[in-house]
Amino acid sequence: MIGAEPIWAAGRPGPLQGAGVLVCHGFSGSPASVRDSAQYLIDQGAAVVCPLLPGHGTTWQQMRLTTHQDWYSVLPPALDWLTERTRVQVVIGLSMGGSLALRIAQLEQVAGVALVNPSVGTDSPTYRLVPLLAKVLPTVRGIGSDIKAEGVTEPSYPRAPLAAVASMRELWRLVV
């Protein structure tokens, strides 16, 4: 997937020098979806890490084999990297990355959390059926690019694996 490469940038002189920012991308997305925001923070002097979550930035078939535990597993080492290099660390999460940001803030020491359109639950009764549906229906139509800006698209999967959606629901229960 184009732009899926993780972001690892050490801090430099600027107004945010000494700050470390861990950025968590969303479900079926990749660092491509937060690259512009991350670059702004880097330009301001912050050290920024946006890891590629396991099963993301590849194919929906690979995502289908991962769980929220796998997605979370890359965050503590990224936060450790920032902690070694910066005075203060914050976490930013986009969509499902918001749930991951909340989870790491529950378990690790961070100075702050910023959530952008966080995915932390739904009122849809259909979601209660996802664990059962995942056993007979492996995927549904993917979220796709939901950016409204003209000419801007977000790389994403054409299909969403229901097993991964079910795991995301488990993550929601941990953070809400």
Question: Which residues fall in each region the model found?
Answer:
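Short beta-strand-to-loop junctions in surface cap/lid or active-site-entrance loops
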Residues: 1-19
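The alpha/beta-hydrolase serine catalytic core
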Residues: 111-112, 118-176
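Conserved alpha/beta-hydrolase
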Residues: 38-60
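Gly/Ala-rich beta-loop-alpha elbow adjacent to hydrolase catalytic centers
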Residues: 93-97, 101
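The conserved beta1-alpha1 loop
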Residues: 22-28
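The serine-hydrolase catalytic nucleophile loop
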Residues: 28-39
